[in-house]
Swiss-Prot record:
Residues 39-107 form the KH type-2 domain. GO terms for molecular function: mRNA binding; rRNA binding; structural constituent of ribosome. One of its GO terms (cellular component) is cytosolic small ribosomal subunit. It comes from the Bacteria. GO terms for biological process: translation. Belongs to the universal ribosomal protein uS3 family. Gene3D superfamilies: 3.30.300.20, Ribosomal protein S3, C-terminal domain. This is Small ribosomal subunit protein uS3. The gene is rpsC. Coiled coil: none annotated. Pfam families: KH_2, Ribosomal_S3_C. InterPro entries: KH_dom (IPR004087), KH_dom-like_a/b (IPR015946), KH_dom_type_2 (IPR004044), KH_sf_prok-type (IPR009019), Ribosomal_S3_C_sf (IPR036419), Ribosomal_uS3_bac-typ (IPR005704), Ribosomal_uS3_C (IPR001351), Ribosomal_uS3_CS (IPR018280).
Length: 232
């Protein structure tokens, strides 16, 4: 089943944190979820050239805090922080509550599945041969310390009449191992022959002991009972 299930979804709460962390009542849940979707859609469209990895949304006390993980923080921030202020105002308007924007830099974009997939997509749109783009991405990831990487492209590869899939892998990608830190993402390239889909799996090693305490959810349980001292 490791081949069928979504690699990120099956690891949530084990070695993967959620991209949205908030709790809501039944009547507010749908509005919050719709607001999250619109905020992500807006930021993804606005920051197409900023090498966007992922967007984390938190909702503390009738406000919204958005953390943007990007390989090019300067593009997001803009000159003297002007662009961030515009984004904050736009997000506050969409969500309907005060907004805060945080920027987190992705130090090694070659080890981020979303950024690797987007890079391959942009190369395919520039008519680079798909095998060359795949091999270059795999070699860069392995050179920077990945334990394993697999890239799959599907569609009318090279302008072929019949669509097909091809994949390239180096190292290990253990999808059945839940403690394995596997970064998975999808991307798409819009070429003159049609859309080509790209899937990327990057294995960074095993995480022993689960998520860090900051991301893990503390289990709710009864307080340990005090032991009575026996008579001597």
């Amino acid at each position: 089943m490791g081949q069928k299930v979504h690699p990120n979804g099956i690891r949530l709460g084990i070695v993967k944190p959620w991209n949205a962390t908030w709790f809501a009542n039944t009547k507010d849940f749908a509005d919050n979820l719709d607001g999250d979707f619109k905020v992500r859609q807006f930021l993804t469209k606005e920051l197409q050239k900023a090498s966007l990895s992922r967007i984390v949304i938190e909702r503390p006390a009738k406000s919204i805090r958005v953390t943007i993980h990007t390989a090019r923080p300067g593009v997001v921030i803009g000159k003297k922080g002007e662009d961030v202020e515009k984004l904050r105002a736009a997000v506050a308007k969409i969500a309907g509550v005060p907004a805060q924007i945080n920027i987190a830099e992705v130090r090694k974009p070659e080890l981020d599945a979303q950024l690797v997939g987007d890079s391959i997509a942009s190369q395919l749109e520039r008519r680079v041969m798909f095998r060359r783009a795949m091999k270059r991405a795999v070699q860069n990831a392995m050179r920077l310390g990945a334990k394993g990487i697999k890239v799959e492209v599907s569609g009318r590869l090279g302008g072929a009449e019949i669509a097909r899939s091809e994949w390239y892998r180096e190292g290990r990608v253990p999808l059945h191992t839940l403690r394995a830190d596997i970064d998975y993402a999808t991307s798409s390239a819009h070429t003159q022959y049609g859309v080509i889909g790209i899937k990327t799996w990057i294995f960074k090693g095993e995480i022993l002991g689960g998520m860090p305490a900051a991301n893990a959810v503390e289990p709710k349980g009864d307080k340990p009972k005090k032991q009575r001292k026996g008579r001597k």
